[in-house]
UniProtKB/Swiss-Prot annotation:
Residues 102-224 form the MPN domain. InterPro entries: MPN, RadC_JAB, RuvA_2-like, UPF0758, UPF0758_CS, UPF0758_N. Keywords: Hydrolase, Metal-binding, Metalloprotease, Protease, Zinc. Residues 1-20 are annotated as: Disordered. This is UPF0758 protein VV0285. Belongs to the UPF0758 family. GO terms for molecular function: metal ion binding; metallopeptidase activity. Zn(2+) binds at residues 173, 175, 186. GO terms for biological process: proteolysis. Gene3D superfamilies: Cytidine Deaminase, domain 2. Pfam families: RadC, UPF0758_N. A motif (JAMM motif) lies at residues 173-186.
Length: 224
């Protein structure tokens, strides 16, 4: 059963228009994306089944093509559509950061870094290079693998920061375990980078650690 054939009181599109998207459940939002159900399940029932099967909306959205398309009611076209939506979301967050002050929109910064890092299966060390107005000049993954003192090279970070004529940096990396709590090694790396960058008058404004559903800020902890 499609959305248009649902009883009016059960139609998530109408609910969204009347009450706003925040009033919808995860299943209702997913139903709008799916548009139609399958034999034996209307679209709301299908959405609810998929959320239970994957475990969460985030796990559904981060599924690879094979895992996504093995479900009845989903296919390559839906997978492509979903990837386009996710990419547009990342670009929106990136544009918001690039046009504004990264420090005055910390929630956008967290959302953007989370979207870039949380679903990686390997650790990745990410850097936002900022100008003297704290606007993002460039952002990129600098190191991948096990993020420790042996794999993060302060000299390379300094070199890259000078290349972009950056005045400040925001650092970030993910914990594939899902636990965002920073380790002692994370704190040591941050101090080494801050010291090295300080020699060329470049500040480290924050270091975010991205986990599963949580992002920890060193600045908020008073560690920077």
């Amino acid at each position: 059963m499609s959305l248009k054939n649902l009883p009016s009181e059960s139609m998530p599109r109408e609910k969204l228009l009347q009450r706003g998207p925040q009033s919808l459940s995860d299943a209702e939002l997913l139903a709008i994306f799916l548009r139609t159900g399958t034999q034996g399940m209307n679209v709301i029932e299908l959405a609810d089944f998929l959320l239970r099967d994957f475990g969460s909306l985030r796990k559904l959205f981060s599924a690879d093509e094979q895992s996504f398309c093995r479900h009845k009611g989903l296919g390559q076209a839906k997978y492509v559509q979903l990837q386009a939506v996710l990419e547009m979301t990342q670009r929106y967050l990136a544009e918001t950061l690039q046009r504004g002050d990264a420090l005055t929109s910390p929630q956008h910064t967290k959302l953007y870094l989370s979207s870039m890092l949380r679903d990686r299966h390997r650790e990745a060390f990410y850097v936002l290079f900022l100008d003297n107005q704290n606007r993002v000049i460039k952002d990129e993954v600098m190191f991948e693998g096990t993020i420790d003192a042996a794999s993060v090279y302060p000299r390379e970070v300094v070199k890259r920061a000078l290349h972009y004529n950056a005045a400040a940096l925001i650092l970030a990396h993910n914990h594939p375990s899902g636990v965002a709590e920073p380790s002692q090694a994370d704190r040591r790396i941050t101090r080494r980078l801050s010291d090295a960058l300080g020699l060329v008058d470049i500040r480290v404004l924050d270091h975010f650690v991205v986990g599963d559903g949580e992002v920890v800020s060193f600045a908020e902890r008073g560690w920077i």
